[in-house]
């Protein structure tokens, strides 16, 4: 972008205005990764739908969500203790790569409390959200 006008004189005001407009339409470069901590076991269908809503909320807020409880049940069996423990371990490893931990919901499950304890131990910033932040997630 050239800061000179048509007559080749410097026109910094117009140049800066154009730069500002271009910035508005470009996606933000840096998006911190956040670990999504929410219930999964119990009502798995409803809890997974809620977790997807929480992830969508994180994206709208400018973050990259990481929700291992949406990924690992795709190939690990939550009902088998060894595989559940492996999934929890891998989730904690993924948490170490995250900038913050976001805790959603009114209930703190046993798995969530383990994740929160690990986040505190690692010195991660923990944010608590009580209500569902996103209700327009389309399942289709």
Spans of features found by a protein language model:
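Catalytic phosphate/metal-binding cores of nucleic-acid and nucleotide-processing enzymes, i.e., regions
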Residues: 1-140
């Amino acid at each position: 972008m050239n800061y000179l006008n048509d007559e080749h004189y410097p026109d910094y005001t117009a140049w800066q205005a154009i730069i500002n407009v271009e910035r508005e339409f470009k996606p933000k470069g840096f998006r911190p990764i956040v670990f999504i901590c929410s219930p999964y076991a119990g009502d798995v269908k409803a809890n997974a739908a809620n977790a997807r809503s929480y992830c969508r909320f994180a994206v709208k807020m400018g973050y990259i969500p990481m929700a291992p409880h949406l990924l690992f049940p795709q190939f690990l069996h939550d009902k088998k203790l060894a595989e559940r423990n492996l999934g929890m371990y891998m989730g904690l490893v993924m948490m170490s790569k995250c900038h913050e931990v976001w805790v959603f919901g009114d209930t703190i499950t046993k798995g969530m409390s383990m994740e929160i304890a690990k986040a505190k131990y690692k010195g991660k910033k923990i944010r608590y959200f009580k209500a569902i932040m996103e209700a327009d997630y389309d399942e289709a």
